[in-house]
Amino acid sequence: MYRELISHKIAELKKERKAIILAHNYQLGEIQDAADFVGDSLELARKAAKVDAGVIVFCGVHFMAETAAILSPEKIVLAPEPRAGCPMADMISGAELREFKSRHPGLPVVCYVNSTAEVKAESDICCTSANAVKVVESLKSDTVLFVPDQYLGAFVKERTSKKIISWPGYCPSHARIKPEDIVNLKKHYPAARVIVHPESRPEVTALADEVLSTGQMVSYATRADVKELIVGTEIGMLYRLRKENPDKLFIPVSEQAVCANMKMTTLPKLLASLENMQTVVSVPEEIRVKAVGAVERMLRVV
């Protein structure tokens, strides 16, 4: 009853504020249910760039709300939980990227969207896990710098002819997914397909039937002619997969693959955000104008 009451208040305030609620696939189920749109980083970036609403309430982690603010400076972007950061995004700073570039002069920088606005501003083009291969292939250079995710960089390297020089960052949640977990689960579910996220270690992706972004996982789960899927990504993804495919069995590779930051946003925090119009996320204009080019170039890659 309490949850229904909060959800009703959120829906009312959303109309009053002329707001749209965007949520990442890793958010709590209650947040996904309250959202107008749920998706992966690429889908959310595209949505943020096109929405008519004057207020965007972003339920995710900080870099996602920042990306929305970069793309839509005329809109109010709210983060219900401003402390929700991204450990991988914090593994490289703008200064560190500038030093990295100085050691490899002239090479283009492909920046995973899981990064700060400052790092995006120092990059040539952004990418997400859904379009990383296409983005790298779109560049003329035979060698590219890839930041900050070394495992996504390794995934791209296997699928292109280009030389990838990666920054040694990683996602702690996906790093908890172990190959032996997949091997053990396959013994119990021999008919199951294995789908994993490209932020996983190479020895994990090597055991997968498909390596997919979270948005691609949703599409694959719906169309795949299989009743059992072993899923290697952050545990929040299982909520949407099960909700949209109640006739299928989804087994997490690891219950330890949890992003605590993604779970910080709750219904009461979402309600408070709309009530008080907080917390506004903004990017300094001198950084935004540099970062927006990298993000928009990514969005132009089909």
UniProtKB/Swiss-Prot annotation:
It catalyses: iminosuccinate + dihydroxyacetone phosphate = quinolinate + phosphate + 2 H2O + H(+). Iminosuccinate binds at H24, S41, Y112, V113, N114, S129, H197, P198, E199, T214. It is an enzyme of class 2 (transferase). Transmembrane segments: none annotated. Pathway: Cofactor biosynthesis; NAD(+) biosynthesis; quinolinate from iminoaspartate: step 1/1. Binds 1 [4Fe-4S] cluster per subunit. Its main location: cytoplasm. Pfam families: NadA. It comes from the Bacteria. GO terms for cellular component: cytoplasm. Its cofactor is [4Fe-4S] cluster. One of its GO terms (molecular function) is metal ion binding. Its EC number is 2.5.1.72. [4Fe-4S] cluster binds at C86, C171, C259. The keyword 4Fe-4S applies. Keywords: 4Fe-4S, Cytoplasm, Iron, Iron-sulfur, Metal-binding, Pyridine nucleotide biosynthesis, Transferase. It is found in: Cytoplasm. One of its GO terms (biological process) is 'de novo' NAD biosynthetic process from L-aspartate. Belongs to the quinolinate synthase family. Type 2 subfamily. PANTHER family: QUINOLINATE SYNTHASE, CHLOROPLASTIC, QUINOLINATE SYNTHETASE A. Catalyzes the condensation of iminoaspartate with dihydroxyacetone phosphate to form quinolinate. This is Quinolinate synthase. It comes from Dehalococcoides mccartyi (strain ATCC BAA-2100 / JCM 16839 / KCTC 5957 / BAV1). The lineage of its organism: Bacteria, Bacillati, Chloroflexota, Dehalococcoidia, Dehalococcoidales. The gene is nadA.
